[in-house]
Amino acid sequence: MSDINATRLPIFWFIYFPCVSDVDSTLTRGER
């Protein structure tokens, strides 16, 4: 099970992190 998590986690971050930074920049633009 740990092997599956080790391979899935990087993929999850590659998909999740850009979405978070995209929303973050949108919120920052909205405040300014």
UniProtKB/Swiss-Prot annotation:
Record key words, sorted: Toxin
The record's account of how the chain is modified after translation: Processed by the macrocyclase-peptidase enzyme POPB to yield a toxic cyclic octapeptide. POPB first removes 10 residues from the N-terminus. Conformational trapping of the remaining peptide forces the enzyme to release this intermediate rather than proceed to macrocyclization. The enzyme rebinds the remaining peptide in a different conformation and catalyzes macrocyclization of the N-terminal 8 residues.
Coiled-coil portions: none
Propeptide: 1-10, 19-32
Function: Probable toxin that belongs to the MSDIN-like toxin family responsible for a large number of food poisoning cases and deaths.
Naturally occurring in which organism (per UniProt): Amanita exitialis (Guangzhou destroying angel)
Molecular function GO labels: toxin activity
Cyclopeptide (Ile-Pro) crosslink location in chain: I11-P18
Keyword flag Zinc: no
Domain of life: Eukaryota
Stated family: Belongs to the MSDIN fungal toxin family.
InterPro entries (UniProt xref): Amanitin/phalloidin (IPR027582)
UniProt name for this protein: MSDIN-like toxin proprotein 1
Keyword Magnesium in record: no
Tissues in which the UniProt entry reports expression: Expressed in basidiocarps.
